Amino acid sequence: MYNSEKLVYKGEKFDSRKELDFYKRFIEPLESDNFKVFLHPHYDILDSYMLGGLKGRKMVYTPDVVIKNSKGDVIHVFDVKNSIQPNKKGKEYTPSVYMSEGAKDRIRLFQSRYGLPVEIVVPMRKIVRMTVYGTTKSIGLHEFEKIDYDIRDLWKQVGNQC
């Protein structure tokens, strides 16, 4: 989020008020022995490389929040955005997500390398809107009061519609 005010809460830095709001309302209540929360972890999405004797830079993706279960499995990768607009055709169609082309590319590279969906989220007054970007079949736009859902269940629903 460009030109956003950087905030600090409990010693952690947040890129925007929306991101902090998402953390306080949806993530903080989950923190326990069963779930481990990671803020702004770095994932390599393109390794460094040699180019005519020069070293090309690696590329990293930094999601806003990653949640792992007690076994250490990643169960959510969240990227907080300012806006997700429903498709005029309905919530089952691809919604409009406003982000830079660079952000879109990084998300696609992350999903390709790690096989994990990046959940694009926007906290609203009472709910959080969520979609996944970059897939050939849209999972649509979903709204949740809590983030206790399993993204794999949504994949199964979409897969059964194919």
Where are these regions (language model features)?
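Electrostatic, structured charged patches in enzyme active sites and in nucleic-acid/phosphate-binding
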Residues: 1-162
